[in-house]
Design a protein with these regions (language model features):
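Transmembrane alpha-helical segments in multi-pass inner-membrane proteins
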Residues: 208, 222-266
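Membrane-interface helix caps of multi-pass small-molecule transporters
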Residues: 22-26, 47, 51, 77-89, ...
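Single transmembrane alpha-helix segments in multi-pass membrane proteins
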Residues: 3-56, 68, 73-94, 241-248
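Hydrophobic core segments of alpha-helical transmembrane domains in multi-pass membrane transport
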Residues: 17-18, 42-46, 72, 105-109, ...
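Helix-loop-helix "hairpin" substructures at the membrane interface of multi-pass membrane proteins
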Residues: 146-224, 254
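Interfacial loop-to-helix junctions that mark the boundaries of transmembrane helices
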Residues: 1-6, 58-65, 141-152
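Alpha-helical transmembrane segments and their helix-start/interface "positive-inside/aromatic belt" motifs
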Residues: 88-102, 194-197, 202
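Transmembrane helix-bundle core of multi-pass membrane transporters
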Residues: 104-168, 228
């Protein structure tokens, strides 16, 4: 059961990163900065935790919630920076993405190793993010398999399914795909290409950033070096997983488990 739990935790991180990258790529952008975005998500969570703890807060659920809010904020900011550079200034997407990945890894490691931010294992603060459904113990093996996981796992599943529905079943999704596949035609049809690309990149970054904080929540033996390597690897695996799942968010759920299984076995 411990092996399966490890797979679920890794799959959660990958699923957030993959879903975020799919949204970005649907708008016509290959964001190689996903590892950096995940680093900023993790860093933002640590910042939120420290601010709340330094203010004397001791409510475990509030600590976790604030950490997630800060992770979203940091990820959105770095996503906006990437959007500005690649959409408005038209800089090379690959170079910009790699620069953000390098910058994110450096900021994360420097902030934690220098002692500016003391990142504590967030999972210790709230059982709600380790076991979203406390009643799972009464369901035996069925409960252990399906209901014994942290809330972020279920959030990742919901986000992936919702993304698939929005992309394929709504006017917004149709416009977004049009922007990515043929921006000139989309612009001629009256679709604001710049706005859609900005929104897709920022929203995708926010979702990917949750993958960074998910790793921190689920890390049983947290250290700066191990987290640095794990988050970086998860970011690149997420980008590869987008191609493996053929840019389909719902299929990425299965793909995340496959990649997680192989990663855990390795």
């Amino acid at each position: 059961m411990l092996f399966f739990t490890s797979i679920v935790k890794q799959a959660t991180v990958l699923l957030f990163g993959t879903t975020g990258e799919i949204i970005t790529e649907k708008a016509g952008h290959l964001n190689l900065g996903i590892p950096g975005v995940m680093f900023f998500g993790a860093l933002g969570g640590c910042v939120g935790l420290n601010i709340y703890a330094n203010c004397g807060g001791n409510n475990s659920f509030a600590i976790v919630l604030i950490a997630i809010i800060f992770a979203i904020l940091f990820s959105a900011i770095i996503g906006a920076v990437y959007s500005f550079l690649t959409v408005s200034l038209r800089s090379n997407q690959n170079i910009t993405g790699l620069a953000i990945s390098t910058f994110g890894a450096g900021c994360y490691k420097f902030s934690l190793q220098s002692g500016i931010i003391n990142c504590i294992k967030l999972s210790a603060y709230s059982d709600a993010f380790q076991h979203a459904f406390p009643f799972y113990t009464s369901l035996g093996g069925f409960g252990d398999i399906f209901f014994s996981h942290g809330a972020l796992f279920y959030i990742a599943i919901i986000v992936a399914v919702a993304t698939g529905l929005i992309l394929n079943k709504t006017r917004t999704g149709l416009f977004l795909r049009a922007v990515g596949e043929n921006p000139a035609t989309a612009d001629a049809a009256g679709i604001n290409v710049t706005t859609y690309r900005y929104l897709a990149t920022i929203i995708g970054s926010v979702i990917a950033g949750l993958g960074g904080i998910a790793y921190i929540f689920y890390s049983s033996n947290f250290s700066v070096d191990s987290a640095n390597a794990a988050v970086d690897a998860s970011g690149w695996l997420s980008i590869a997983l987008v191609i493996f799942t053929m840019w389909k968010p719902t299929l990425s759920i299965l793909g995340a488990f496959v990649f997680s299984l192989l990663s855990t076995m390795g």
